[in-house]
Amino acid sequence: MAAKIYHLDVVSAEKQMFSGLVEKIQVTGSEGELGIFPGHAPLLTAIKPGMVRIVKEHGNEEYIYLSGGVLEVQPSTVTVLADTAIRGEDLDEARAMESKRKAEEHINNSHGDIDYAQASAELSKALAKLRVIELTKKAM
């Protein structure tokens, strides 16, 4: 019988955010949404700004915002190396809303492809933070 759990480490440049046994995770890779279950094939991929949804050993869920990074899947261990990682409960909703508003304003007033691309990336990050906040509130 295959294992129903595996070890997950979520690490940012500042600190280790999570280390423990999990049933599965969900993360946004460079090619789209990924669900990583026990026994997943080895994989190395870039992570887009978004969240990692962690389903812990006994079914409890945790959400962590990621600004991007790398996902490595090995037979019994999964590692998320994030540029920036923030727990859902540590995100500031008012700041995320203000970032969203500013990014939308920059998109509407952009002059050139570079301005638009930068504002679009900032909007994606703000929306991801707001989604993590929303899911964290539901899980509590």
UniProtKB/Swiss-Prot annotation:
Record GO terms (molecular function): ATP binding; proton-transporting ATP synthase activity, rotational mechanism
A GO cellular-component term linked to this record: proton-transporting ATP synthase complex
Principal location listed in the UniProt entry: membrane
Keyword Cell membrane on entry: yes
Membrane topology: Peripheral membrane protein
Source taxon at top rank: Bacteria
Keyword annotations from UniProtKB, A to Z: ATP synthesis, Cell inner membrane, Cell membrane, CF(1), Hydrogen ion transport, Ion transport, Membrane, Transport
Record localization: Cell inner membrane
InterPro entries named among the record's database cross-references: ATP_F1_dsu/esu_C_sf, ATP_synth_F1_dsu/esu, ATP_synth_F1_dsu/esu_N, ATP_synth_F1_esu_C, ATPsynth_dsu/esu_N
Pfam families to which the protein is assigned, alphabetical: ATP-synt_DE, ATP-synt_DE_N
Role played: Produces ATP from ADP in the presence of a proton gradient across the membrane.
Subunit and partners: F-type ATPases have 2 components, CF(1) - the catalytic core - and CF(0) - the membrane proton channel. CF(1) has five subunits: alpha(3), beta(3), gamma(1), delta(1), epsilon(1). CF(0) has three main subunits: a, b and c.
Family: Belongs to the ATPase epsilon chain family.
Name of protein: ATP synthase epsilon chain
Organism, as annotated: Sodalis glossinidius (strain morsitans)
